[in-house]
C-alpha cells in the first residue's frame, strides 16, 4: 500500500480523453462521457461562457 512516487508511475496507463465527435478536440472524457471543450454528451447546446474571451475596452477617455 504505497501512495507516493511509485503510485504516480501507474497514472498514465489508461486513456482519460479521446477526440470529440462534435468539436474535434482531444477533450472527450471516456469515463464521464462528455466533452470538456464543447459539452457534447452533457448538453445539446455548445458550451460557451462570457469569461472565455477578453472584453473589449468600451469606455471613452474623458479629456
From Swiss-Prot:
GO cellular component assignments: cytosolic large ribosomal subunit
Protein name, per record: Large ribosomal subunit protein eL37
Recorded family membership: Belongs to the eukaryotic ribosomal protein eL37 family.
Residues annotated to bind Zn(2+): 20, 23, 35, 38
Cofactor: how bound: Binds 1 zinc ion per subunit.
Zinc finger (C4-type): 20-38
PROSITE patterns documented for this protein: RIBOSOMAL_L37E (PS01077)
Signal peptide (residue range): none
Keywords: Metal-binding, Ribonucleoprotein, Ribosomal protein, RNA-binding, rRNA-binding, Zinc, Zinc-finger
Molecular function in Gene Ontology: rRNA binding; structural constituent of ribosome; zinc ion binding
Biological role: Binds to the 23S rRNA.
Amino acid at each position: 500500500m504505497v501512495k507516493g512516487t511509485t503510485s504516480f508511475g501507474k497514472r498514465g496507463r489508461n486513456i482519460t480523453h479521446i477526440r470529440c465527435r462534435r468539436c474535434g478536440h482531444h477533450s472527450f472524457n471516456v469515463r464521464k462521457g462528455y466533452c470538456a471543450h464543447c459539452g457534447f454528451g452533457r448538453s445539446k447546446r455548445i458550451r460557451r461562457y462570457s469569461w472565455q474571451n477578453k472584453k473589449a475596452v468600451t469606455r471613452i477617455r474623458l479629456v
